[in-house]
Amino acid sequence: MLFRSIHLTKFLEFPKSFKNENLNQKWLELIKIRNVCNISIEEKRASKEIGSSLEASLKINLDKKLNDISEDVDFSELCITSSAEVIYLENSETKVQTTKAEGSKCQVCWKITKDACSRKTCPQQTE
């Protein structure tokens, strides 16, 4: 019996209604911001100030023009860090300050917080 490989089949085409240029532009901009954050995180990792990105706490300066696309984004989730604070400034380029997160590590979500998660349940997981 001859089997045809899944790798030889064609993918279904997405309906044109799935194309959302505004959403695409938003995520392209968010990825640019995340890349700046990742560079800052990697500098701290290279200098051995932090181990993983979850040991990092970010302060992100963004131009006010980016408020519309980023106000509903949790940058700690996007950048996989323990915390992230966003500050909007007039005519500002994207700048990131990375510091070592303070507090204790949750055994459930692995984030480092000053308000330690209960070891049995984690507020991050109940949201």
Give the ranges of each region predicted by the language model:
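Histidine-centered, metal-coordinating catalytic motifs and their short helical/loop contexts
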Residues: 41, 110
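C-terminal edge-of-domain segments
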Residues: 73-107
